[in-house]
From Swiss-Prot:
It catalyses: Release of an N-terminal amino acid, Xaa-|-Yaa-, in which Xaa is preferably Leu, but may be other amino acids including Pro although not Arg or Lys, and Yaa may be Pro. Amino acid amides and methyl esters are also readily hydrolyzed, but rates on arylamides are exceedingly low; Release of an N-terminal amino acid, preferentially leucine, but not glutamic or aspartic acids. NCBIfam families: PRK00913.1-1, PRK00913.1-2, PRK00913.1-4. It is an enzyme of class 3 (hydrolase). The keyword Manganese applies. It comes from Actinobacillus pleuropneumoniae serotype 3 (strain JL03). Its main location: cytoplasm. This is Probable cytosol aminopeptidase. Mn(2+) 2 binds at residues 269, 274, 292, 353. Belongs to the peptidase M17 family. Pfam families: Peptidase_M17, Peptidase_M17_N. GO terms for cellular component: cytoplasm. Mn(2+) 1 binds at residues 274, 351, 353. Its cofactor is Mn(2+). The lineage of its organism: Bacteria, Pseudomonadati, Pseudomonadota, Gammaproteobacteria, Pasteurellales. It comes from the Bacteria.
Length: 499
């Protein structure tokens, strides 16, 4: 898909399809008013007849509009004027995509980016439009022998901005929106890939692929022998039941003006399949446990977006690849594991494995002397119960970092909600036989999981994103979401802008 921006008048658009908005009740947007004057009241006459009310998401396709050089005019309902939210805006963009896809149009000139969206600028209108279009057009059919038949997709979208002074911001939105959308799609592709293909070795190859594609990326892959030498016993215990060995992939992106600047480290839990191990999961929906590597997928997608945006930062992405399977050699409830930093953990449930992989990985990244560390993990069902599928759960030992992430989440419309940490939750992790237990009981399960991780982050500023409820969708719309690539990308954009 080709995207571009311009500042032009609606009456001069010679294109396959011209898209303008109509507010509720039957109120023309500025661009639609210009078209109405040009067509001598043709559009307002149709509205008076009741052909379109203007409710958000309604569409009306017109052909041969008098005096209008465009082949088609698509009217899109935008709801009540001045009340358009980010969510509604993305929905009307997606309705535009659906309507245009059913025509033979190869090009679209879109004036919806001129609409007033609450609290947003032209930059955000253009960027959100690109992200919404790419979301609408995404499909994952790699393993279908007969590909679904689709109409020929339009190839080019031109976004109009009302003020010439906003063109520079719109161009920036164009480049960043394309990069972030690419990163989201990469994350989705990896997460949607079946676990008989996407195993820890596959994740490692993807990480190497980024290094082959970008000159300022270097990838190092650590195998189980190296992990054993480092004392990553908790990580390795989780992997013991699988015939697919674990791999820790370290993707180093260096583009800071000061090559010695401390890096931002992104850690992704990469359980390419989680059966639960000896504490085996119910069979219902176990297939969705291929998505237990959503954290690693989001780190991979973010590193892709980062490289495309060429942000002047030093960033390290870590993919903690592993499988959790039942086997005669699998770790057991009751085992006590000595972690890389020396703390011992009693295993009370082998299905609480992600935190064991992460605790050693979080210790490993100390060697980079990071500015900060953020880990992403589909960690707990408890977070899904608490926050549903809309907000990722955020925990942090730093108010500054937590606020920066929440700000980025709001900006990118990739929402997160902060949950507490504290010594009262640490009490729930007490064990009679080890320094820590790997679970803290039924109450506050998302928080006690984050609290456990905090024991391994004492040497740097740290935040944890529990994306168990946001990394994928179930049911008819089943598939990976690519979250929180947008949040992380915005966080990095903000870091680059403020240094």
């Amino acid at each position: 898909m080709e995207f571009s921006v311009k500042n032009g008048s609606v009456e001069k658009q010679r294109t396959a399809c011209l898209v303008v908005g109509v507010y509720e009740p039957r109120r023309l947007s500025a661009a639609a008013e210009q078209l109405d004057k040009l067509s001598e009241g043709y559009i307002s006459t149709l509205l008076r007849r009741g052909d379109l009310e203007g409710k958000a998401g309604q569409t009306l396709l017109l052909h041969n509009v008098p005096n209008v050089p465009a082949d088609r005019v698509l009217l899109v309902g935008c709801g009540k004027e001045r009340e358009l939210t980010e969510r509604q805006y993305k929905q009307i963009i997606q309705k535009m995509v659906q309507a245009v896809s059913e025509t033979g149009s190869m090009e679209v000139v879109c004036f919806l980016t001129e609409l007033h969206v609450k609290g947003r600028t032209s930059y955000w209108n253009v960027r959100f439009a690109i992200e919404a279009i790419q979301e609408s057009l995404y499909s994952y059919n790699d393993f279908k022998s007969i590909k679904p038949e689709v109409r020929r997709e339009f190839r080019r979208v031109i976004f109009n901005v009302a003020n010439r002074k906003d063109l520079a911001d719109a161009e920036r939105a164009l480049e960043q929106g394309k990069a972030i959308s690419t990163g989201v799609a990469f994350a989705k592709n990896v997460a949607n890939c079946p676990p008989n293909v996407c195993n820890p070795a596959y994740l490692a190859e993807l990480a190497k692929g980024l290094a082959a594609e970008y000159d300022n990326i270097r990838t190092t892959v650590i195998d189980e022998a190296e992990m054993a030498a480092l004392g990553m016993n908790a990580y390795l215990a989780v992997s013991r039941g699988s015939q697919n060995p674990a791999y820790l992939s370290v993707i180093e992106y260096k583009n800071h003006p000061n090559p010695d600047a401390k890096p931002i480290v992104l850690v992704g839990k990469g359980l390419t399949f989680d059966s639960g191990g000896i504490s085996i999961k119910p069979s219902d929906s176990m297939d969705e446990m291929k998505y237990d590597m959503g954290g690693a997928a989001s780190v991979y997608g973010t590193m892709k977006a980062l490289a495309e945006m060429k942000l002047p930062l030093n960033v390290i992405g870590v993919l903690a690849g592993c499988e959790n399977m039942p086997d005669g050699n699998a770790y057991r409830p009751g085992d006590i594991l000595t972690t890389m930093n020396g703390l011992t953990v009693e295993v009370l449930n082998t299905d609480a494995e992600g935190r064991l992989v992460l605790c050693d990985t979080l210790t490993y990244v100390e060697r980079f002397e990071p500015e900060l560390v953020i880990d992403m993990a589909t960690l707990t069902g408890a977070c899904m119960i608490a926050l549903g599928a809309h907000n990722s759960g955020l925990m942090s030992t730093s108010n500054v970092l937590a606020n920066d992430l929440l700000n980025a989440a709001e900006q990118a419309d990739d929402k997160a909600w902060r949950l507490p940490l504290g010594e009262e939750y640490q009490e729930q992790l007490k064990s009679n036989f080890a320094d820590l237990a790997n679970i803290g009981g039924r109450l506050g399960g998302a928080i006690t999981a984050g609290q456990l991780l905090s024991n391994f982050t004492k040497k740097y500023v740290w935040a944890h994103l529990d994306i168990a409820g946001t990394a994928w969708k179930s049911g008819v719309a089943k598939g990976a979401t690519g979250r929180p690539v947008s949040l992380l990308s915005q966080f990095l954009i903000n870091k680059a802008n403020n240094q």
